[in-house]
């Protein structure tokens, strides 16, 4: 089994939608993909994927579990600890747009828990290259900025794995039942539908 020095995990958190966005008013009020509970996410084979020294970028929204009401941010910290990672810092993506639920705040951000396993060995060229907040307009539900992945490829050595990936990205292997969803020119393997899981090499 191939071991990875970089993991990006964008979990299908057990949430619902808070309403239609003005930027994408044609969206349904229900998510169009299956979600996972915290207990299910804890069972992901992260220890199988991760190398002895490994970096992890774990995406998390500002919402909470629709059943347990536990904030996903708390769940995310529990996940990285259970997977054997140490928290390093919190990164914020300012999407500039988002839903406005029943309250004064429009939810325009998502968070990333940047963590490491083993020894955090940074490339000397990466020192001071990142800020803990970046701004880029959201283009579609759950689609993450290409610049985020490009920076990881530039400053962090591979192999790299994108977990619950939808897009095929240069420099990353992909894992998930919607891998390649947004790639018109890529034919999905039959096993993607059959097993609900697929590992594709970039």
What is each of the regions a protein language model found here?
Residues 1-202:
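Class I S-adenosyl-L-methionine-dependent methyltransferase catalytic core
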């Amino acid at each position: 089994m191939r071991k990875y020095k970089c993991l990006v995990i964008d979990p299908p958190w057990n949430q619902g939608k808070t309403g239609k966005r003005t930027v994408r008013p044609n969206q349904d009020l229900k998510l169009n993909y299956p979600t996972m509970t915290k207990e299910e996410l804890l069972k992901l084979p992260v220890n199988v994927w991760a190398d002895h020294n490994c970096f992890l970028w774990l995406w998390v929204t500002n919402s909470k579990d629709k059943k347990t009401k536990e904030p996903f941010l708390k769940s995310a910290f529990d996940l990285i600890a259970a997977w054997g990672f140490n928290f390093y810092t919190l990164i914020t993506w300012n999407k500039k747009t988002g839903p406005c639920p029943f309250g004064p705040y429009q939810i325009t951000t998502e968070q990333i828990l940047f963590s490491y396993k083993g020894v955090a060995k940074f490339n000397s060229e990466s020192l001071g290259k990142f800020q803990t907040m970046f701004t880029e307009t959201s283009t579609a539900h759950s689609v993450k900025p290409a610049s985020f992945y490009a920076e990881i490829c530039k400053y962090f050595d591979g192999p790299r794995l994108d977990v619950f990936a939808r897009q095929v990205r240069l420099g990353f292997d992909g894992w998930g039942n919607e891998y390649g969803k947004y790639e018109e020119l890529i034919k999905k393997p039959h096993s993607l539908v059959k097993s609900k899981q697929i590992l594709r090499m970039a």
